[in-house]
Amino acid sequence: MVCTEYPPIPGGIGRYTSHLTNALLKLGLDVYVVCDEKGDGQYSGLYPYNPHNSDVLLKIVNDLKPDIVHVQFEAGLYGLIWDTKNPRKVGTYIDQFYVKCKIPIVTTFHSGPITLSQWITPSSLVKKSGKMGKLGIPLRALLRYWKYFLNYQAFNNITKEKLRMSRAGIVFSHYMSKLLDHGSSSSRCHVIYHGSEPAIYPPLNKKEAREKFSLPQEDGHRIALAHGFRTAGKGWDILKKMNIPKGWTLVVNSSKDYYNKENLELSWQGETNILDLRRGYLREDELSTLFYASDAVILPYKVTAGSGVMFDALAHGLPFVATDLRFFREFAAQGLGITAKRNPHEFSKGLEDLRSNYVKYKEAVNMFKEKLKWDSVAKQHSTLYHAAARRE
């Protein structure tokens, strides 16, 4: 099992990998984890900025001789290499591992290719100064657009190339499967939902859970939770601009990504219906308590990703209000939440709509969450491992 990020290193992909590993061990599989030296895996040596990641993995595989190598893939976890002279050339520090490894590889893609509009924003193209062409178009912006476009194509090719070189790929939605596999008849990309289960069972009642975080206790008052790392991709910039509907409080809890140096500055000063817990990265029991204290999660994401927060929320019986991205649409179509255009007005309206039909959404979520149990998820992985190991 390969994942740079692994507990006690904080991070959603590391949490996921740890839970999956434990579930596979319960099935009787022998699982060995390779991670960062600060993680609790059996092997270490991986790091996002280590140009020798491939060599580290190849040596471990050669010594251990496993039946399957399972890589939890998010490009940033293994180091992105940008060629300034050739924008078409983008790679990672485990590319050579995929080329040279003789053992079948299964790769889980925690995010897929992104759209051009998500990759290139107007602010990334236009600076305050620049040479102007005859038509008044900033020449530097045009050149920058072309470079970003080439980078965009190359970046998306990273995930597609990893799938091509894997015996099998795993994604968390049918949309992500189609995006990566392009409708290929090879059926190389498999949908296995992101597992999640509460750390506390039986569930805490709402009153008790809210007391632990000093949250509003009024009867009928609902809490929408925004939880995760403080990165721009989470889209939290619209939260302060929302007109939070009557009867709702927005609760925010964020932490800094361990590897990502980005640390979005968020200020909720003067907001009476937004509570910032400032609790940072939570332990498993604390996170479950916070979900039990809430009624919904709010996910104003800017880019498509396999949202672990959404799956954690669903596992605790919470519907969502999320950006109208195709990933979230797939789950909204199953009655698990609402998608909205990514602006303050539409997200406020989404909370109102959720409240008016809350029982319907809650029932759908409670039925769906059975699919996220780790025992079921691990069995699907085990079946795929055996099929991948048999196939020549």
Predicted regions and their residues:
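A short helix/loop element that forms part of the nucleotide-sugar donor recognition site in Leloir-type
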Residues: 202-217, 363
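Short hydrophobic beta-strand element within catalytic cores of glycosyltransferases
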Residues: 319-322
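Nucleotide-activated donor-binding/catalytic signature segment of Leloir-type glycosyltransferases, i.e.
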Residues: 254, 262-289
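Membrane-proximal helix-turn-helix segments that form the acceptor-binding/catalytic region
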Residues: 91-100, 125, 130-169
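A charged, aromatic-enriched C-terminal amphipathic alpha-helix characteristic of glycosyltransferases
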Residues: 356-387
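Conserved acidic donor-binding segment of nucleotide-sugar-dependent glycosyltransferases
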Residues: 334-345, 351-358
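A short, active-site helix/loop in glycosyltransferases that binds the activated sugar's phosphate group
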Residues: 149-189, 196-198
